Regions:
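Gram-negative (and chloroplast) outer-membrane scaffold detector with strong preference
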Residues: 25-26, 32-34, 49, 56-134, ...
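C-terminal beta-signal and terminal closure region of outer-membrane beta-barrel proteins
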Residues: 185-199
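Conserved active-site loop/cleft motifs that coordinate metal ions or position small ligands
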Residues: 162-167
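Short, solvent-exposed beta-strand-terminating loops
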Residues: 168-175
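Bacterial Sec-dependent N-terminal signal peptides
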Residues: 1-23, 204, 208
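Solvent-exposed, glycine/polar-rich loop segments of beta-barrel outer-membrane systems
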Residues: 134-135, 180-188
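Solvent-exposed loop/turn segments connecting transmembrane beta-strands
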Residues: 39-46, 109-111
Length: 208
């Protein structure tokens, strides 16, 4: 009798674990972060904040499609040399909003661990404001479209909660700049391959 009861409990746990990413399930989650640093001897400062909620639906077992939204704010304050015998400080403030449709595939390793690959196409827009302690401020609007693939793994401490660790694997960004102070525009393209294992991305997801 005890053996049958134990077998039943194990079976239920297995079904619960597999149900996390089965067809018809939903996932809600995202990430939030704050960073601040100060560099000597130039007294350069950097601070940033981001929040990125997301929601997805499993269209098939282990395959989810969804949409993420993001907000990013950063401020850089640095020593830019001297002017007229005095110290020159330059400040740059960046504010960006993003929309990120995504597709994600999970591969189960055990009841509590799953590897995944996340493909997303972020669309972002915002502005970057540069100024210094002398007359003159430069404001530029920025728009970008890109694509990225991020591998990672999810740990499930409970049947509905997942803690994720991932790295940026492959990224591509096409960014355009529109300077308000003049008629000149800027345009950059960036393609990068390689995972920075020292800077993992951490997120929390809720499955139901």
């Amino acid at each position: 009798m005890k053996k049958l009861l134990l077998l039943a409990v194990v079976s239920v746990l297995g079904l619960t674990a597999s149900a996390q990413t089965e067809k018809g399930s939903f996932v809600l989650g995202g990430s939030i972060g704050y960073y601040k640093d100060k560099y000597t001897p130039d007294n350069n400062k950097l601070s940033s904040f981001h929040i990125a909620p997301s929601a997805g639906y499993f269209v098939a077992d282990n395959i989810a499609v969804g949409l993420g939204l993001g907000y990013w704010q950063a401020k850089y304050d640095q020593n830019a040399g001297t002017i007229n015998g005095g110290a020159l400080r330059a400040t740059m403030k960046e504010e960006l909003f993003s929309i990120r449709p995504f597709v994600r595939y999970y591969k189960s390793v055990s009841d509590q661990f799953k590897f995944f690959g996340n493909l997303q196409v972020p669309l972002s827009f915002g502005n970057i404001k540069s100024s210094a302690n002398y007359p003159g401020t430069n404001i530029r609007k920025t728009n970008a479209v890109g694509a990225s693939f991020s591998p990672g793994f999810a740990y499930f401490p409970t049947s509905k909660l997942g803690i994720e660790f991932s790295v940026e694997g492959i990224t591509y960004n096409d960014t355009s700049y529109d300077y308000e102070s003049n008629t000149s525009n800027g345009h950059t393209k960036q393609f990068r391959i390689g995972a920075n294992l020292m800077s993992p991305l951490i997120g929390v997801q809720y499955y139901f």
